[in-house]
Amino acid sequence: MKLAYWMYAGPAHIGTLRIASSFKNVHAIMHAPLGDDYFNVMRSMLERERNFTPVTASIVDRNVLARGSQEKVVDNIVRKDQEERPDLIVLTPTCTSSILQEDLENFVARAQLDAQGDVILADVNHYRVNELQAGDRTLQQIVQFYINKARKKGDLATEKTPQPSVNIIGISTLGFHNNHDIRELKTLMAELGISVNLVIPDKASVHDLKKLPQAWFNLVPYRELGLPTAKYLEQEFDQPYVDITPMGVVETARCIRAIQGAINDQGATADYEAFIEEQTLHVSQAAWFSRSIDCQNLTGKKAIVFGDNTHAVAMTKILAREMGIHVVLAGTYCKYDADWFRQEVSEYCDEILISEDHGEIADAIARLEPAAIFGTQMERHVGKRLNIPCGVIAAPIHIQNFPIGYRPFVGYEGTNQIADLVYNSFTLGMEDHLLEIFGGHDTKEVITTTMSASSDLNWTTEAQGQLNKVPGFVRGKVKRNTEKYARAQGLSEISLEVLYAAKESVGA
């Protein structure tokens, strides 16, 4: 456990709660001290939910510490079972309450005697895994629980649907543009003549999970959520899965071809080549845009990409392959899946950074001085401090990246959205310079381009005035070069003479 003022992936219990609250009529009981129960507020605000978040905190207080938790936890489970009538109650501790080392399995067994619905304990090690890994494990656990339950009852639906069908696995609450992506994926499947059997966990009933084996194949659009579940279903029912994220023109085509292979292996005679060509050349604007003069203006411009594995890999490939943008650094905070990330992006970028430390990423951005950043909410903050534009492409995100309008990132409409995001993220031509010449509300003060809080150098008024005359898009570089020169000369003050000497030293 570590104290941090910014985390890319939250603690494990957040992942479990995201899965539980994504299902329909499932309630989560969180065994936690006050302070760990912020999930309800976060979800209600970010997802703009009309309904109450189905999560209850069973607070660990001094009475619990004195007498033990069993009575309180069991009472809370039974009370919620009677009040809400959920199909399933998931009990989860947090990393804080795990310190108590209580036998929560026993609490669940005791509560199950009085509860009408099912009760399970989230099988997650809260010290070893983060939000993404815990969500992945919880989804697999719930699917396994209901598959085994149906098997015992003898009503497991294993016969395939007459026409090709798919389970879409991994759409959850608080996911990056998930509610837009699922609409686009459903549209894409309909155009391919494939019916959607189930979408899990988003708005799915746990009683429908026994129908999962009926689909011809499983689609896992995000690497962070759903892969273990798909592998379990493949192992149990010989059900193939496609785990290619359909993001960008090239990867969407690759995903569709993989789907074609999966259903044709089971007796279908699908041929999607004409569909891919039609969408790529005429429906999606992205392929046309990438050959236009607007996009050619971006060729060779430097960009940094950072996010979760799915979005960072997809974005790196789109920028490098489809738009000719020079990716100087690609990074991820998913350290547990670092090998896959390296394998996917190594040929498309100069540097790879795998880190959960936002300061390390900020320093890399300041060092490399890209023309644009594509990252999370944190990289957006860094970009604002460094005066570098940033397009947000991955969670964690704030409210403005839960848009009300339709903004998918996957499929062919997703390619249009990404093209817009990329183009609008770069500062166009002399835009900044013109704004400064003509003044107005957009005039910017000089800001430092180092991520440290203070500088050991003082600028004289004359030198600062001269620096202000430098066009905005190179001013940061001039400032850094001058300060670097001053430090090398052992100076503590930067005057006009020092500024000119620094300029000469770099041959400008």
Swiss-Prot record:
Active-site residues annotated for this sequence: D294
Cofactor(s) in the UniProt record: [4Fe-4S] cluster
The UniProt keyword set, sorted, is:
4Fe-4S, ATP-binding, Chlorophyll biosynthesis, Iron, Iron-sulfur, Metal-binding, Nucleotide-binding, Oxidoreductase, Photosynthesis
| InterPro entries listed in its UniProt record | ChlB/BchB/BchZ, LI-POR_suB-like_C, Nase/OxRdtase_comp1, P-CP_red_C, Protochl_reductB, Protochlorophyllide_Rdtase
Q: Name one GO biological process term.
A: photosynthesis, dark reaction
Provide the binding site for [4Fe-4S] cluster: D36
Binding note for cofactor = Binds 1 [4Fe-4S] cluster per heterodimer. The cluster is bound at the heterodimer interface by residues from both subunits.
Record-annotated residues binding substrate? G429, M430
Disulphide bonds in the chain: none
Q: Which Pfam families match?
A: Oxidored_nitro, PCP_red
The EC number on file is 1.3.7.7
The answer, when asked if Oxidoreductase is one of the entry's keywords, is yes
- Subunit arrangement? Protochlorophyllide reductase is composed of three subunits; ChlL, ChlN and ChlB. Forms a heterotetramer of two ChlB and two ChlN subunits.
The entry sums up its family as follows:
Belongs to the ChlB/BchB/BchZ family.
**Identification of the protein by name:** Light-independent protochlorophyllide reductase subunit B
